[in-house]
């Protein structure tokens, strides 16, 4: 099986396929974050990195059997700006043909969520030589309007999965797939909370000063004024995290520890 993973991150797709004992002939990855790339190559040294999704030509690759990816969600998330897929001039992008036309005309795009259309471009190009290509796309829960745009573009209805049932995060997600004809059940609740995953011993440099904490609170207030819901939430050990991040900019995962500052 030849696999192409877009927006690959640390290559969780390879972890899942390995757990399922699915043999991979070639695993192509489109990722631009150097830290994510380094982690992937450490865990899976045979991975073939092919760079920016916007420059990807499927004809340069071996025939693809499985396409997976989770395109950026910032402009779609209820916690974000909710501008959707649009240009910097706020022209909404409602189809792949429209996206390609705007791209050829030199328009610049708002944020990164528009990269969904690059996933669709690549899926469409693969379908030309492999109509039976298996695909899986993940994104955040979004407004009905944009979910309908995704459904129409990809040709299947999104499946709502409550990923918080299997993690210590509040993660409701939508998946689009033709694997198993899209018959994907909800996972069983594992009852995971922060106390189940946090380390007992934490180095002191991970604890925030009063000054740093005030700065983070002010940052969230400024985002709220801009109608952008992204910002830190303080949770305790009996909660689920808003989101658990590895690296990246900003601090969202704050946990209150008794007798200590926030971590």
Question: Locations of the language-model features?
Answer:
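Conserved active-site and SAM-binding loop architecture
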Residues: 1-263
């Amino acid at each position: 099986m030849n696999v192409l993973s877009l927006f690959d991150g640390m290559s969780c797709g390879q972890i899942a396929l390995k757990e399922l004992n699915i043999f991979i002939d070639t695993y192509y990855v489109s990722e631009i974050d150097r830290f994510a790339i380094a982690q992937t190559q450490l865990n899976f040294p045979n991975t073939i990195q092919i760079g920016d999704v916007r420059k990807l030509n499927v004809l340069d690759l071996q025939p693809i059997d499985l396409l997976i990816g989770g395109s950026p969600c910032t402009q779609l998330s209820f916690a974000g700006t909710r501008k959707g897929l649009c240009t910097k001039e706020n022209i909404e992008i409602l189809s792949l043909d429209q996206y390609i036309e705007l791209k050829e005309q030199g328009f610049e795009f708002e944020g990164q969520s528009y990269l969904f259309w690059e996933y669709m471009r690549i899926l469409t190009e693969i379908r030309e030589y492999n109509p039976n290509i298996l695909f899986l796309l993940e994104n955040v829960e979004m407004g009905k309007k944009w979910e309908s745009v995704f459904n129409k573009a990809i040709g299947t209805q999104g499946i709502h999965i409550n990923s918080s049932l299997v993690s210590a995060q509040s993660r409701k997600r939508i998946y689009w797939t033709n694997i198993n004809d899209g018959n994907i059940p909800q996972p069983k609740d594992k009852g995971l909370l922060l106390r189940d995953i946090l380390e007992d011993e934490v180095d002191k440099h991970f604890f925030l000063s009063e000054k740093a904490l005030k700065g983070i609170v002010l940052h969230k207030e400024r985002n709220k004024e801009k109608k952008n819901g992204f910002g830190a939430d303080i949770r305790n050990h009996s909660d689920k995290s808003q989101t658990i991040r590895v690296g990246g900019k900003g601090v969202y995962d704050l946990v209150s520890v008794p007798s200590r500052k926030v971590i």
